[in-house]
């Protein structure tokens, strides 16, 4: 059996190896960037006591860039290398459509990062003296509310705009997301 300390060091190294320059994380080596990976990194690192400013540096900006024009959250956002817009990194658009599962993971990550970043500057914040990008939580709330189906649909939730309701979104788009969104609105 591997001692806990050795396991934690190896886990930290592995998580850090998945980190991308824009603060996002890939799901596995050679894999895609996904906000769910950021959520998993936060959960694992906090549970193991290995969450450091270096690990979360840039993550809040990445999560906020996943917000779509609708107010919901997509799986990822273009990086500066993928989207050359001549502007600041903040202008990188989201990659994909807003989705209930992604929104839940992104909001839970954002709330956690708001709490962690309160008085804990990350390395890039120390260098640039800028505050992390904010998510438009009011817009996210409007999008989340619009995902509830009509009475004829049983009042259930859909995961994406103009899609059918689905039972799994009772958690992602219903109880889980609204609880996290409410907490984030109170923290901000």
Language-model features and meaning:
Residues 13-19, 63-72, 137-152:
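Amphipathic alpha-helical segments within extended alpha-helical solenoids and repeat-rich scaffolds
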Residues 5-36:
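Asp-box/WD-like beta-propeller blade repeats and closely related beta-sheet repeat scaffolds
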Residues 1-2, 26-54, 69, 74-139, ...:
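An alpha-helical repeat/solenoid feature that recognizes helix-turn-helix modules
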Residues 4, 8-12, 56-60, 133, ...:
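Core helices of alpha-solenoid repeat scaffolds
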